[in-house]
């Protein structure tokens, strides 16, 4: 259906693509895999008409094509669904889907025909959305489905999806992929760009791997393993993804006893010792993030006690939690962990600004030194610390969030989905950082929906189900099957809760 052959693209002296080829077939989902900077975005922009290749050929349905604009690519049946939907929030679903192409009757928009047409598209996709509803207020997941309906209204047969599940829950992700399977069954070709390798293996029939702007390999998904994909993407073995260092746990740093919040979680008890990484696993909605937020004092609790190094922390008091030595790296770093318009330097010191003041004035030298110290330790890749934090990659943004909390000198660090939305190479760096911090005596609580991450990094794994802590697994006894049995209730709890 689509073939890109030996494509190259440069921007000034920078070679973004060099001799890259890609083939998409009707009825197949094809994963495009590579680290940030591998050239995936440039390739997609060539396919979608944003950029023209300097060399190579693009064939669509057996015809040689040269796109001068996104409109030409769209007319050829190629559509792209971005991670952040680009819809008009104050218009309805139907108006967004048919923007600029609304059916007319006697010179005026025929709203009944518009709603009927869009309703039919949504029904074909199995999407229960009201076409008359305004887009404002829809979840990101629903907005992406509106974008897919819009693509189908253009008779798109090639759908490019750029990190579509990065901001979705597990249930939303499954619903999205049900729609993708429907599209494939109708003969569409889907190009999926994702950092989530488990999604690629579950949903895609073919893979293409890129590294440093070059094609590495292509082939059937069945011919690859996680190890071979990672090696192709980063040139390193998969074992380097989880560089866990051996530690001997020390004294208890965090003690949680009988933590409860009505309707959310109940009677949660566990301890974490210095030097340990304790994983908190479970299905979406099990209450893991809510427990973390309650420990840190963001959310209230009805009962229970939190102690840090023997000191009781009052409920609902984040300042007390910070003073006691707790740090929390939140699940959504862009919305909750960073101020995107501020500099890297200021974001890295937000938690310690009071220490960096001289009277009423900020000691800029001390601020710069503090930010520089921690970002250097975390091997941050940035041009200047005065640049906006929004200019960084996802992995480097996560390092800034870590720097912000490490600057407080915590005894306990809670990290919620620490590698969500970052590429494989950045994952390895975040994992190495957590392992080094634990080896230095920090107590780490790691909440993650990425089971290989939990299994690879945790000394112990606590599993939650429906707001309750249902079991504990040692590193030696843990497996994906054992965790999922506990998380789903398919088997009696294994192990004991501390």
From Swiss-Prot:
Residues 2-237, 247-491 form the ABC transporter domain. GO terms for molecular function: ABC-type D-ribose transporter activity; ATP binding; ATP hydrolysis activity. Keywords: ATP-binding, Cell membrane, Membrane, Nucleotide-binding, Plasmid, Repeat, Sugar transport, Translocase, Transport. PROSITE patterns: ABC_TRANSPORTER_1 (PS00211), ABC_TRANSPORTER_2 (PS50893), RBSA (PS51254). It is found in: Cell membrane. ATP binds at residues 34-41. Signal peptide: none annotated. It catalyses: D-ribose(out) + ATP + H2O = D-ribose(in) + ADP + phosphate + H(+). Its main location: membrane. The keyword Repeat applies. Disulfide bonds: none annotated. The keyword Membrane applies. It is a peripheral membrane protein. Its EC number is 7.5.2.7. It is an enzyme of class 7 (translocase). Belongs to the ABC transporter superfamily. Ribose importer (TC 3.A.1.2.1) family. Part of the ABC transporter complex RbsABC involved in ribose import. Responsible for energy coupling to the transport system. The complex is composed of an ATP-binding protein (RbsA), two transmembrane proteins (RbsC) and a solute-binding protein (RbsB). This is Ribose import ATP-binding protein RbsA. It comes from Deinococcus geothermalis (strain DSM 11300 / CIP 105573 / AG-3a).
């Amino acid at each position: 259906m689509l073939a890109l052959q030996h494509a190259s693209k440069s921007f000034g002296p920078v070679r973004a693509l060099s001799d890259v080829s890609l083939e998409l077939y009707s009825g197949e989902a094809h994963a495009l895999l590579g680290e940030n900077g591998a050239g995936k975005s440039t390739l997609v922009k060539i396919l979608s008409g944003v950029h023209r290749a300097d060399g190579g050929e693009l064939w669509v349905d057996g015809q040689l094509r040269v796109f001068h604009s996104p409109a030409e690519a769209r007319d050829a049946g190629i559509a792209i669904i971005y991670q952040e939907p680009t819809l008009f929030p104050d218009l309805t679903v139907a108006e967004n889907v048919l923007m600029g192409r609304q059916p007319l009757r006697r010179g005026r928009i025929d709203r009944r025909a518009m709603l009927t047409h869009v309703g039919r598209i949504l029904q074909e996709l199995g999407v229960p959305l009201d076409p008359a509803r305004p887009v404002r207020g829809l979840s990101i997941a629903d907005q992406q489905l509106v974008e897919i309906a819009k693509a189908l209204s253009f008779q798109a047969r090639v759908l490019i999806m750029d990190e579509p599940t990065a901001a979705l829950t597990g249930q939303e992700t499954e619903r999205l992929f049900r729609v993708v399977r429907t599209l494939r069954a109708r003969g569409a070709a889907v190009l999926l760009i994702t950092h989530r390798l488990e999604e690629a293996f579950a949903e895609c029939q073919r893979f293409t791997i890129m590294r440093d702007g070059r094609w590495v390999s292509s082939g059937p998904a069945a011919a690859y393993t996680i190890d071979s994909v990672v090696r192709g993407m980063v040139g390193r073995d998969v074992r380097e993804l989880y560089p866990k260092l051996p530690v001997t746990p020390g004294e208890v740093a965090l003690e949680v006893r009988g933590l409860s919040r009505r309707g959310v979680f109940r009677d949660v008890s566990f301890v974490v010792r210095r030097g340990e990484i304790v994983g908190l696993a479970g299905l979406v909605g099990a209450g893991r993030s809510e427990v973390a937020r309650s420990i840190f004092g963001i959310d209230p609790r009805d009962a229970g006690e939190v102690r840090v190094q023997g000191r009781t922390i009052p409920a609902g008091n984040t300042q007390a939690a910070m003073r006691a030595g707790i740090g929390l790296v939140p699940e959504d770093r862009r919305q909750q962990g960073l101020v995107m318009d501020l500099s890297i330097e200021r974001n890295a010191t937000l938690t310690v600004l009071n220490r960096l003041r001289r009277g009423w004035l900020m000691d800029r030298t001390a601020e710069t030194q503090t930010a520089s110290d921690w970002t250097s330790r975390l091997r941050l890749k940035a041009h200047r610390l005065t640049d906006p934090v929004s200019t960084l990659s996802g992995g480097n943004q996560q390092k800034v969030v870590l720097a912000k909390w490490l600057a407080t000198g915590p005894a306990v660090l809670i990290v919620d989905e620490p590698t969500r939305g970052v590429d494989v190479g950045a994952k390895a760096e975040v994992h190495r950082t957590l392992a080094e911090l634990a080896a230095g005596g920090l107590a780490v609580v790691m909440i993650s929906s990425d089971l290989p991450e939990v299994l690879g990094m945790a000394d112990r794994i606590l599993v939650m189900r429906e707001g309750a802590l249902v079991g504990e697994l040692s590193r030696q006894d843990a497996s994906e099957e054992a965790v999922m049995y506990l998380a789903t209730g398919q088997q009696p709890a294994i192990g004991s809760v501390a």
